Amino acid sequence: MYSVLLNPSNTEIYSFLTERIYRELVVIFATCKVNYKGRAESVASESPRLIILKPDGTVIIHESVKREPLNWQPPGTKIEIMNDYPLKIVAQRKRPKEVIEIDLKEVFYITSAEVKDGDFVIKGREIDIVNTIIQNPSMIEEGFVPLTREYNTPYGKIDLVGLDKKGNFVIIEVKRSKAQLSAVSQLYRYYLHIRETKEDKVRGILVAPDLTTHARELLQKLGLEFIRYDIQKYSSY
């Protein structure tokens, strides 16, 4: 559920905010003046700004540029609505002692909504790429069979080990971003170690969205292979 007030009066603003702060996410677009007192002091003159009041006490004030807010207060902030003229929002915390006072000169709109926390899953990590390969081994090549992940060596853990259709041992090093020379060198250390301990032929494959020119040259020189991983293509897996 959500509510919207367009060009509200001071009485409407006061009633709306006092009923909803700490209960709903409130967004205000208004011409306002902002005073800050705390570890320093600042005054932001009258200008149109976006003000966000979150149920956990977070207060954020945005202007038209930059990602960072003009001012903000963290969760746990005490928020009060002062029925003065102009109407004032006071956001205060004790440790450290900081106060933001927002004088609402002209409010164009206010919205509020019951916002719930959903699941948050980061995809595109190297472990996610390894999981995708295990679920879709043909993305390496037809006939590839994954055997072991996190294979221990004296030089670190190999991301994934498997066999190709000819029975050759395949070691795979995964990178979530453009692979550098260091990734090729790491793969080659694994390759040399496995080649010394296995009688079978060994292949080394670097899996990444891309790699640098120098990394590609070294990869080819060392007889290793590269497979491009399309993060967008496989993000649904």
From Swiss-Prot:
Transmembrane regions: none
Gene this protein is translated from: nucS
Similarity comment text for this entry: Belongs to the NucS endonuclease family.
Stored InterPro entries: Endonuclease_NucS, NucS_C, NucS_N, NucS_N_sf, Restrct_endonuc-II-like, tRNA_endonuc-like_dom_sf
Source taxon at top rank: Archaea
Free-text function comment from the UniProt entry: Cleaves both 3' and 5' ssDNA extremities of branched DNA structures.
Classification via CDD domains: NucS-like
Main localization, broad class: cytoplasm
UniProt entry tagged with the keyword Transit peptide: no
Keyword terms of this UniProt record: Cytoplasm, DNA-binding, Endonuclease, Hydrolase, Nuclease
Record-level Gene Ontology MF annotations: DNA binding; single-stranded DNA endodeoxyribonuclease activity
Protein name: Endonuclease NucS
GO CC entries: cytoplasm
Enzyme class: hydrolase
Gene3D superfamilies: 2.70.180.20, 3.40.1350.10
Species of origin: Saccharolobus islandicus (strain L.S.2.15 / Lassen #1)
Subcellular location per the Swiss-Prot or TrEMBL entry: Cytoplasm
Entry's EC annotation: 3.1.-.-
